[in-house]
């Protein structure tokens, strides 16, 4: 029986000494009822299916493009059964959500403006090699299935992940589609998407970060620091690979693509509506959008919109049946006024120049009891950062297709509706909040202390209390302050800044104006949101979103340089607020570590956990033992942690006891000839009945139970160690002193309990 005809194309990615990667595109075999379907392979073992579908009719009442991108991670792709109770996939993982955003951002601006039919792109990961990263491959899959559908889409779009490999020997190379294991030796890692425009490749999306090992590679091994120039070099290095991917897609679409689909395209307004609004409102809107204060400006704009609607679309007016068009034309005119002023006068909405930064304030220790807190303000954007420290056993466990199974630094970003003066839903985070938290997390991970140096799980929460431009970069700044306030020994301060872009055709040439520290309105009216975070020495994270079909890499390189100047200014403000880690808060747990021989792990744990549980009960500390013999001990106070460390050392790193050493012991067994006293876990001694007279006012003791009971604390001294290592004990001091010291010890132990 003959199967369906399969059409394919391949793009070979040559990484030189790092080998070749092959991306294979197929269509015709799977998901034949979808408008467009593509199977994409990375080498032999990683594959995914992308299917694009379109609604049969426009959605009523929608004034935006209803595009949905979903990524389905199937656990069978890695030969695993889901770990959930029902043993099936549930809500998407964080990796899947971030991949959805990675696909959506370059795809959305490539559709023709004005589509109101629902479009859905579903990417299903069907198989994956353990060491592979699938996200940028999924961009290519989504691009291809959308082109095959015949929708009005200005593809193809190529997506590639690039890693800067540098071992400090002087030879560095950007490697396409790196593996997870290779990223451990990489200085910088970026996902780039773009499309071919003439002889060049225009960049549409960038998501980049320094790696957790970047600091060590740069500072200790002499690797190249990821400066702005190096990042721009990486964008250029990505272009040939993007071109190869786009050419393979275009070749396949040419042979197997569907005829163009006639999808209705709706204009927001007709020319006559715009002309009427322009004639009436230009002068007044120019005045309104020179008001610096956001709330005052928005209130004035809304009030004037009502006037314009009444004047042009009121009862009996020419546009009485076209109020929606007038409102849209009003918004479009506002956008044009703001953009024209920026390009011609080099002046922005609030009166700033193109490179000016709003007023900055930074303050630490703003909340009681929490482990670390700070507030960072940039103009009307206000972010509160709060840091919480805990044992490493509280690190996040990850169940996804990634080989990463846990992470100790968790960054959560909240954007409540009141931050923009609005009402709305609160509760579980939306995709945008997850994405912003992940961006801030990537910006800070490269400067976190090593796990061995600072053995804590760290949860950082960014609360966007007020928003008027780049709360995500404000979160980076507030988090730097908060982490230092919590006593986290960051390797360097990190600051972030959001850059914008306005472009227009002037005398047949496209003119670009890059804006530093954009407002919310400039984000809405501009062509780009370009976020850059980093230390004084190098870039730690980048995110680029654009509404254009692509931006020349040279323009992005210039914006990177402009962003560095702003970042250095912000860093000076952060350093003035806190220049070094504070002492840890009294409410923060104290965590210490001790190394024990691996063959002693069982002894510390004990039968069915009896020994480790006893130590935890006796000291009040929490103990975690790792496979390499590292024991992490956490407690609310230093004394408890030290007591637990002594107990662990007594078992796994025992010191030979010496005559004359004193201990506060616990009676564990009574016999006719005396009492056995536990000095440390696993180390007991005999307090002979003849010695008990010191606890009985010098009188003879006939029954040990008359003086001591199991569980009782007693201060003792080692008086003899025989040839077999058995310990003989005596109560401490003279008769009266021994009684007093034992009583004091009992009282003290009861108070601590």
UniProtKB/Swiss-Prot annotation:
Swiss-Prot/TrEMBL GO biological process terms: mRNA catabolic process; RNA processing
Location within or outside the cell: Cytoplasm
Domain KH: 589-648
Disordered: annotated segments: 733-753
SUPFAM superfamilies: Eukaryotic type KH-domain (KH-domain type I), Nucleic acid-binding proteins, Ribonuclease PH domain 2-like, Ribosomal protein S5 domain 2-like
Glycoprotein among keywords: no
Names of required cofactors: Mg(2+)
HAMAP family attached to this UniProt entry: PNPase
Family: Belongs to the polyribonucleotide nucleotidyltransferase family.
Official protein name in the record: Polyribonucleotide nucleotidyltransferase
Lineage of producing organism: Bacteria, Bacillati, Actinomycetota, Actinomycetes, Micrococcales
């Amino acid at each position: 029986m003959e199967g369906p005809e399969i059409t394919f194309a391949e793009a070979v990615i040559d990484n030189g000494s790092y080998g070749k990667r092959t991306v294979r595109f197929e269509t015709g075999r799977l998901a034949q009822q979808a408008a467009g379907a593509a199977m994409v392979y990375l080498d032999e073992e990683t594959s995914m299916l992308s299917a694009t579908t379109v609604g049969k009719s426009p959605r009523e009442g929608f004034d935006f493009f209803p595009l949905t991108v979903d990524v389905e991670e199937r656990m069978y792709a890695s030969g695993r059964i889901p770990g959930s109770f029902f043993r099936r996939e549930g809500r998407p993982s964080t990796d899947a959500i971030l991949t959805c955003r990675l696909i959506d951002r370059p795809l959305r601006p490539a559709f023709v403006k004005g589509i109101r039919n629902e479009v859905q792109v579903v990417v299903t990961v069907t198989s994956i090699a353990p060491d592979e990263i699938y996200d940028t491959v999924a961009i290519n899959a989504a691009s291809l299935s959308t082109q095959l559908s015949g929708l009005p889409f200005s593809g193809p779009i190529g997506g590639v992940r690039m890693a800067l490999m540098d071992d400090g020997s002087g030879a560095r190379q950007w490697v396409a589609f790196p593996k997870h294991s290779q990223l451990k030796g990489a200085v910088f890692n970026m996902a780039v998407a773009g499309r071919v425009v003439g002889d060049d490749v225009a960049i549409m999306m960038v998501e980049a970060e320094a790696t957790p090992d970047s600091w060590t590679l740069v500072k200790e091994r002499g690797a190249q620091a990821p400066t702005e120039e190096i990042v721009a070099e990486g964008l250029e290095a990505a272009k040939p690979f993007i071109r190869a991917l786009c050419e393979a897609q275009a070749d396949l679409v040419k042979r197997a693509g569907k005829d163009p689909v006639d999808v209705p395209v709706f204009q927001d307004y007709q020319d006559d509506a715009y002309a009427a609004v322009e004639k009436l409102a230009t002068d007044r809107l120019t005045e309104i959008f020179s008001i610096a204060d956001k709330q005052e400006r928005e209130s004035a704009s809304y009030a004037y919109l009502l006037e314009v609607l009444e004047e042009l679309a009121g009862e009996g007016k020419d546009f009485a049946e076209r109020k929606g068009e007038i409102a849209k034309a009003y918004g479009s005119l506002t956008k044009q006024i703001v953009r024209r002023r920026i390009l011609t006068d080099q002046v922005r909405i609030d009166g700033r120049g193109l490179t000016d930064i709003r007023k900055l304030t930074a303050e630490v220790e703003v909340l009681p009891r929490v482990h670390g807190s700070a507030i960072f303000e940039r103009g009307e954007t206000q972010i509160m950062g709060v840091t919480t420290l805990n044992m490493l056993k509280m690190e996040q466990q990850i169940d996804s297709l990634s080989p990463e199974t846990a992470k100790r630094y968790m960054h959560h970003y909240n954007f409540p509706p009141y931050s923009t003066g609005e009402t709305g839903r609160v509760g579980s985070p939306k995709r945008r909040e997850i994405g912003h938290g992940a961006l801030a997390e990537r910006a800070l991970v490269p400067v976190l202390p090593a796990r061995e140096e600072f053995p804590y799980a760290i949860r950082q929460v960014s609360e966007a209390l007020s928003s008027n431009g780049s709360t995500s970069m404000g979160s980076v700044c507030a988090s730097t302050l908060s982490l230092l306030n919590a006593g986290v020994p960051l390797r360097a301060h990190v600051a972030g800044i959001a850059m914008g872009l306005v472009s227009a055709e002037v005398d047949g040439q496209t003119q670009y104006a890059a804006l530093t520290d954009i407002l919310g309105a400039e984000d809405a009216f501009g062509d780009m949101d370009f976020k850059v975070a980093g230390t004084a020495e190098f870039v730690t994270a980048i995110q680029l979103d654009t509404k254009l079909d692509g931006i020349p890499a040279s323009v992005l390189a210039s914006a990177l340089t402009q962003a560095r100047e702003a970042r250095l200014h912000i860093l000076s403000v952060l350093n003035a607020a806190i220049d070094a880690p504070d002492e840890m808060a009294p409410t923060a747990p104290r965590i210490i570590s001790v190394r024990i021989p691996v063959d002693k792990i069982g002894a510390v744990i004990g039968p069915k956990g009896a020994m480790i549980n006893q130590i935890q009960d006796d000291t009040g500390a929490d103990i975690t033992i790792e496979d390499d013999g590292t024991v992490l001990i956490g407690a609310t106070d230093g004394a408890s942690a030290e007591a637990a460390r002594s107990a662990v050392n007594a078992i796994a790193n025992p010191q030979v006891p010496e005559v004359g050493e004193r201990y506060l012991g616990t009676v564990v067994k009574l016999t006719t000839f005396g009492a056995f006293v536990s000095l440390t876990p696993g180390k007991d001694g005999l307090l002979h009945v003849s010695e008990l007279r010191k606890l009985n006012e010098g009188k003879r003791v006939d029954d040990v139970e008359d003086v001591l009971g199991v569980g009782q604390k007693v201060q003792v001294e080692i008086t003899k160690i025989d040839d077999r290592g058995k310990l003989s004990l005596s109560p401490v001091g003279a008769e009266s002193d021994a009684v007093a010291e034992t009583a004091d010890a009992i009282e003290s132990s009861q108070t601590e309990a």
